[in-house]
Design a protein with these regions (language model features):
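A conserved structural/catalytic subdomain of Rossmann-like adenosyl-cofactor enzymes
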Residues: 1-185
Length: 185
């Protein structure tokens, strides 16, 4: 393995990476923590971007597995070329499936399959902020904290937050000061 860890999901991903032959392709279902976990997770993600073409991540909705609340993704990658860009399809935000009444069926993924095959971005911050298909360059991913692949842009209920990280931090600081002042009174 690339790195020792007791995390079974990370070990499974490492196993898949090592077993794949040059030119081989894989689609692996993994929980969210693989996308953002620090330490071994970050090391494995960097290796995945460097030695493989991680070209697509499909964010799955909750309710499709027997264990309730499981958040999972499908990582699509091939061995041989480094990653240049990653396409994300958010099939989680505002999507509800259950095993009993609204099962995930093939036709629910028709839009994803079309986007996957055509590689035309549907997200546009001005004209279509709810677009579920969006790409990021590998440089944008590497610049993220811990090389996190846990990316969302569609807000629950259709709200899109376009603020920068600096604006968000300033807002949090301002609200924190307001709360501190209120508590002190």
């Amino acid at each position: 393995f690339y790195v020792e860890t007791k995390n079974n999901q990370l070990n499974f991903l490492q196993h898949m990476m090592l077993m794949l032959k040059t030119g081989g392709r894989a689609a692996v279902v993994l929980p969210d923590n693989v996308l953002f976990e620090a330490g071994a997770g970050e090391t494995i993600r960097k290796r995945l971007l460097q030695d493989f073409n991680l070209h697509t991540i499909l964010r799955l909705p909750t309710g499709i597995f027997y264990a309730q609340g499981v958040k999972a993704n499908v990582l699509f990658f091939s061995k041989g070329q480094p990653t240049k860009e990653i396409w994300f399809y958010d099939y989680r935000t505002d999507i509800k499936h259950t095993l009993a009444t609204n099962k995930l069926e093939r036709h629910h993924l028709d839009d994803f399959v079309s986007c996957y095959n055509n590689r035309i971005e549907t997200y546009d911050s001005e004209n279509n902020p709810q677009g579920r298909w969006r790409k990021y360059s590998v440089d944008e991913i590497i610049a993220r904290d811990k090389t996190s692949l846990d990316i969302t842009w569609i807000r629950q209920g259709g709200e899109v937050d376009e603020r920068s990280l600096a604006e968000l931090m300033a807002d949090i600081k301002n609200k924190s000061q307001t709360i501190s002042t209120a508590v002190a009174e």
